[in-house]
Amino acid sequence: HYSGGHQAALAEAPDEGIALFDLWMALGPRDAPIFFPGARAAADLGAGAGDAGPVSRSLRLPDAVTHERFVDTWAAAVAPALASFRPALVVLSLGLDGAEGESEGARLAPETYAFVARQIAGLGVPQLAVLEGGYKLDVLQACVGAYAGALT
């Protein structure tokens, strides 16, 4: 889901020498009520100050998204955006509540999180993953294990 903290960081980023790229994937039905205080719709996110300043991109996946659909969406939208942005560092808010077995209704597999780790590692830049979401210990263990295992 959209994070107000990410948007605040973008809004306060200096325009010189630093570019931030916030790409988030919101899982859930498009007409679902917003459950998080201060959450915004994808349409509320802007382009920022251009090449030298903050940039915000949003991408929303449907409810009950599968691994295959996630991979297809990554290939069509995320990979080209990352390639054109050429980050020097990736800080990933790794929301695990999109995994099958969690309460959100998504059907991402541990393999999906391993895929994300490999894709970001393939950029050849440092990455920092901050674990967010995910409430069932067995699901967390499988997804974190898959993500970390893909980095070795």
Regions found by a protein language model. Give the residues of each.
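C-terminal active-site-proximal or functional interface alpha/beta core segments in diverse enzymes
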Residues: 134-152
